[in-house]
Structure formats: structure tokens, C-alpha cells
Amino acid sequence: MCQSPLHDFLHGLPKCEHHVHLEGCVTPELIFQLAEKNNIQLPNPATHPAYASVEALRARYAEFTSLNDFLDFYFHGMSVLHHQSDFEELAWAYFQKAHADGVHHAEVFFDPQVHQARGIDYETVVSGFTAGCKRAERELGLSTRLILCFVRHLPVDSATKLYELALASNHFESRVVHGLGWSSSEVGPPKDMFREIYASASGKGIRLTAHAGEEGDPTYISTALELGARRIDHGIRLVEDPELMERVAREGIMLTVCPLSNVRLRCVQSVEQVPIRKFLDAGVKFSINSDDPAYFGGYILDNYCAVQEAFQLSILEWRVIAENSVNESWIDEARKAELLKRIDDHVQKHTVVA
């Protein structure tokens, strides 16, 4: 529970989430439930004790040693998803939680390559997640966007085939998929491994983002920008390059910061080391997000509260964060105006009370 006096303000503050992986919302309970339903053999507890029980798995999530350590569990976790209904159920579970945390707009990543590699059709994944998005829009009043995310640990050829399949399915023009991103292992694979895909997508007007500057140094960020990304996911190591940070601020490039994820994956030792204050002072736009909440022990409100407890931000500083989150969302001007009005109303209410 958030200990900040601003908890009620933060809970009710209209939020936009830009960095959450739907596959990162598979809770330990859902992993065991779907494994039984779909007759999936989880790793043997004799050699992988974390899979002895729901409780053991959740406890292991608190002990990740690195990004790659987490990714091993992440990819095991998504292996239980087999049917369209599984993907829809997962998305719907996330949207319900996000809505309860005050999210009004959500842009969510999904990882088709990994599912394809285990024999799941692309259309099964997309149709399931799309159904979850539509239900959230219909029943919760959220606006949603799907971002197709390439993974850096698989060959570029598989990403190219996936991109061509999405194009052939007319998923970008029909707004089933609203953009492209990349994630997974940052350090190791070539920084520019998706250069040709991003060049093609940029030429077609497809929105681009990229995970960079989480474990990798600032050159990973500059490479992503060179390839056409207009949003950077994580990006906390941007502070190591003042010149690049000034460019990011000047060009209005938003970072999608995930504080609790950074702590769990040992990119920083504590939330206090996430450069929130430095970004605010430098005029760098950022949103605050949950990343893989089932694995990192917190959804978006938990991240907001952790930031508040670490930095003691003012209501007006939170207003800047919330408004930047809206203005840099992939939504039309009418929706932006609607959300900005909700933020203004909320701030005015709490400012008067204060």
C-alpha cells in the first residue's frame, strides 16, 4: 500500500500506459491453470524448484539476477498460451487491473515471434489479443493500441517474415496493429539488427518504438533513433550522455520508464536511482509504466506510488507527467483533448482540497 499522502490523488489521476507486455501479465496462478488446461508440461520441479508451486514461482520472481534471467521465466510463462481464448483472457485480465489503477489509455506490446516458434499461428495471437482490446474499450471505456514487438534473441529472418505477414494481413492499414517495437536481450545482438524492417516501416508511416538504454549504454538509444524510433522504451541510461539527452528533450522523444522493473532486473539498486528528477529537470518527456507486472511485483499504480515515495513530486509535476503521457500517445486529437480535460479536472479538484 502506498504510504504517500498523495495516494488518493495518484490513484485517481488519469493514466496512459505505454510499456506493458501482455505476455508479461501471465501470473503464476494463470501459468499453472493454463498449463493444466492445455496439457503443457512445465519445467520439472526436481531440477527447476521454482515450478514446484504457485508460491515458489512467485518467490523466485523476486530474485531475478538480470534481464536474461528474467527472460528465461518470461518465455516459459508464455508457453502455456495456446488458444485464441487464452490470449483474450490474458489481455482482459490486464485491462481490468489497469482500469482499476486509473488507466484510461493503454498501448500494449505482444510477441508473436515467440508464439510462432512454438507452432501458434500469428492470427490466433492477434485475434485473441484484439478481442481483449475490444472488450476493454466496450466494457471499461479504455482506448487501446497493440504494438507488435520483435525479439532480439531470435533471427532477423523470423522478424522479417512476421513483418511481411502483418503487412499482407493489412493489420497496419486496418489499425489492428498500431506500431512496431523491439525488446528481449539488449546487449549481445547487433544494435541495428532490425534496420531494414524499420526503414521499410518508416517509409510506410508505421509508428516505431524500441527498447534501448536499459542495460545497454546510450549508443543503443542513438542507434534506435537513427533507425527511426520516435519513442524509447526504458532509456534510463540516457543520463550518461548529456548531449543525447538534450537532443531527446529538444525533439520531444518520450521515454517509457518502468521503475519497479529496473529494480527487479538490477539495472538500479533502488527506485531513487531511476533518473526521474534528472529527466524532469532536463525537460525529457516520459511516462511511468509496469513493463511485466506479473513478474515484477507491481502494476502501474504501484510504480506511480514507488516514484512518489522516492522523489516526493508535487501535484503540478505529476500533472506534467500525465499530460506528456497523453500528448505522446498514439491517439487522435479528440481523444487527447478528452483525456487532458480529465487530468485538468482531477488536478483542480485536488489542488482546491490542498
From Swiss-Prot:
It is an enzyme of class 3 (hydrolase). It comes from the Eukaryota. Gene3D superfamilies: Metal-dependent hydrolases. Its main location: cytoplasm. Zn(2+) binds at residues 19, 21, 211, 291. Keywords: Cytoplasm, Hydrolase, Metal-binding, Nucleotide metabolism, Nucleus, Zinc. The keyword Hydrolase applies. The record marks 234 as: Important for catalytic activity. This is Adenine deaminase.
